[in-house]
């Protein structure tokens, strides 16, 4: 194992059975942000332990995970399907390894494309982890171009608002289907331009609202506070003039990406991804099918 990874997750890899009670947050990259907010609360009842994102866990990590779960009294988890990545990491499977008195709060996988109407995630069974170059997000304009489909997107205020409303409704429906204990879909509109940095990187106001609801669900004071930094800060998608105008946002538009703090021209992203689609045509077909409803809202 990489020494940097072991050091970063020292409490996880050093977990032993019979230690003090802890809180664990399990899920994707959003889970660590939630954990940071819970850990920053002076009233949160037990220490939190940083755990690798569920998609990074391997069979070699299971002994450390099980030792930690045996000490977990507060467990906050996103929905994870059974046998995820051929490992016993599904929510139902993990819950069986918790102490009988552990409190469990289920929270949603947060996706919001309302600020970034062309941004999309596309998976294909050939390799569900494969993402396009430069940024790990697809662009519906580049997808349709690669598919050979003529399209002049409708970015009228009405269309932009319809896409934003559809995004909120989509998340609310996923929350309902997953049977989560706390929701966040109702927080998106009021968060405005800070609702999301990318479609799966919610902004601080949404994460703080989520953390307070998780605290409340655990019976703790809902006092999560801004940590003084942007939590999911690695990538920021463009916030275009059409979106700023259509949603009435009180911010300046930005047509470029920000990746690792560095501006990246959107044209550079789209050019690299056009080349990528030439070598990965199955992702084009999958993306067009998966996002047909949103394409229709945008005039396709």
Locations of the language-model features?
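Extracellular glycan-modifying ectodomains
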Residues: 1-300
